[in-house]
Amino acid sequence: MVTIKEIARMAGVSTTTVSNVLHKKNARVSEQTIEKVEKLLAENNYIPRLGLNALTNRSSRIICILITTPEFARGSAYETPFYGNMLGNLERLLRENGYYIMIFSDKNVEEIEKMTVGWNVDGIITISMPYRHLKKIAGLSDIPIVSIDMDEMPEGDEVYYQITSEDKSGGKEMGRYLIGQGVKRIVYLANVNHGADHLRFVGVREAVREADYKVLLEEKRLPKDYTQREKCYEDFLKYVGTDTALFFSTDVNAAEMISFLHRNHVKVPEEISVAGMDDDIFASIVYPRLTTIRVNVEEKAQTAVDILLKLIRGRNVEKNVYKTSVKLIERESVKIKSLNT
């Protein structure tokens, strides 16, 4: 296997220059030298010896991504479109900056803690980790940490670097949209009653309170088990034909509900409206296509990577809490109010 020293000799440059090209530290390297070194690296099939760096005190170029598997997940977190989309964006962005990812997901936070201190990583990105666990992990080392969608965060606590969506605004925007279509009842269905799911409900509740006419609002928590969820869905068949909208905290469950309604010969949206949140892959492939709130996953990932790289490089980060945009995506699953009514 060719070494950095051999590449440097062939290119007529120092090993430091080759290392800078490898790690995308190109500020002091000319374009001509970069092209020359990259060509030699490709021609000689150079493979970085990352494993050695990970076991020493040197920079490993590895970023650890810690995922707290949601309690409502059927299996691993990776089965959920949101996590797959987020991981794909993080991997691409970090690779473009010369870093590699190590992923660890578990419902057992103690296992995650062991993972944190067991490897020499340059930084950590957590996804959906409860505040109390993030606080504990942050106290185990000085490794820079950025949190995406921190759960159970105390109000006003801005100690840790965190990225989240405008969940409350998203819920309110959907609530206003549904009310604008003349619904008389909104049923909000979520997997949990805290974190993003709860904030989305708070937004819907505000929209209902500000409505020009009386709108009934119900909040339901979805069972973890699929069979139990089916029984839960049966309860809402009584609302067919009553100007009701079922607003789910995730598109996955909204698509599941539409499938259930089809099997029970209920027409969506003619007899009942269904809406979701996230705008994941299910929103555009289910029939009818789902009206939803788009959560900008790419913006979340980009913001997290930008902040983490600043922390790793010792640069100033302007603030601790960043909120990314949301957007109403109108498709065909909500009954549109007639202009004649």
Question: How should each PLM-predicted stretch be described?
Answer:
Residues 161-188, 198, 228-234, 295-313:
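Hydrophobic alpha-helical segments within soluble ligand-binding/sensing domains
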Residues 172-213, 320-334:
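An alpha-beta-alpha
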Residues 234-341:
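Flexible loop/turn connectors
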Residues 127-170, 252, 278-290:
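Flexible loop/hinge segments that line or gate small-molecule binding clefts
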Residues 91-105, 185-188, 205-229:
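Short beta-strand elements in bilobed, periplasmic/extracellular small-molecule ligand-binding domains
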Residues 5, 44-113:
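Amphipathic helical "hinge" segments at domain boundaries
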Residues 1-59:
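N-terminal helix-turn-helix DNA-binding module of bacterial transcription factors
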Residues 78-96, 170-173, 195-215, 256, ...:
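Short, solvent-exposed amphipathic alpha-helices that sit
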